[in-house]
Amino acid sequence: MNTDVTEAEAAEQVVARFLCGYHKIWQNYFPGLNKRAHWHVMFSARCSPEEGISCRSLHRALYGLYGTDIRTCIERVRDCENDGFIQILDASGQPCTASPTSLIAATDKLHDSFDRHCRETIEALCKALGDREGGRSHGLDCDRAAISAILGFFNSYEQKWRETCELVVRNKGLTPAYANDAMDHLVTYQYWAIVMLLWSASPFGGSRADAPALVIDEINSRMWDALRLGHLAIKERVGNLIRWGFFAEQTIKKHKAVALTPLAGSAITESLAATKPLLYDLYIKLVPQEATA
């Protein structure tokens, strides 16, 4: 593997580019299904045996990770069903309505879309780490080992993101109730995407030292394709990020703007840089090293 490019580029920028690129890949194959729970439904269904995985088992995993209640879990399952990626079955294998006792099984559409997303992810990983021909030349398949490795990487990164959020929120001095509420929101994809937009546009993310803050309208415009959130919803989330210590409010030509706080910017940068070894470990697991020699 030629690492000249990645050695010249800061570790945090390599990781951030891969993470943001991955979410674009996901949105390409699973448009509109960008919530964390959607992601877990798809991974669980793709890895499940032919008879499927129980909705109750999926809920236990989501509750442990995000505190997701069973009603929300079932709503996310229905979203995936409505788009044709999963089918909901009873114990006898017959179609049924989603419930805690139902089973979730992958459709042919999910197998096709998921595996193409997986192969494109491996190509993006190789490119991020300087192996520009890796994913294409090695003819890699999306088997269970590959899926498990990808899932493990993102679970590990999510833990680092959670620790980063806890650091920033704790420094803000919120009451336990407000801090818990903040954490419930910050672990969602919507908040991560908005924060990463600000990080990428800041000096922390490699922009020039005098990079200006972003006005709310610009955040709304950039986030529409990824989040499909309206102006008021973006404004609400930005307001929360100000209250929780991630953003500092500014004014640019009489327009409200925000920039990352120094603490948040530094914490995110450190977390991303610490993820670089995990990204390389993922590459080792996914790409046969004899093929890269």
PLM feature spans:
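Exposed, interaction-prone assembly regions rather than primary DNA-binding/catalytic cores
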Residues: 127-193, 197, 289-293
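Short acidic, hydrophobic short linear motifs in intrinsically disordered regions
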Residues: 50-64, 205-222
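Electrostatic interaction modules used in gene-expression and signaling proteins
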Residues: 193, 197-198, 204-212, 250-252, ...
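Short alpha-helical segments that sit at the start of domains
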Residues: 15-42, 165-200, 205
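Short amphipathic alpha-helical interaction segments
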Residues: 67-82, 228-243
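Short, amphipathic alpha-helical interaction segments positioned at domain boundaries
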Residues: 108-134, 265-293
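A short, conserved structural fragment
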Residues: 81-92, 242-252
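Short, cationic-aromatic polyanion-contact patches
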Residues: 91-117, 252-275
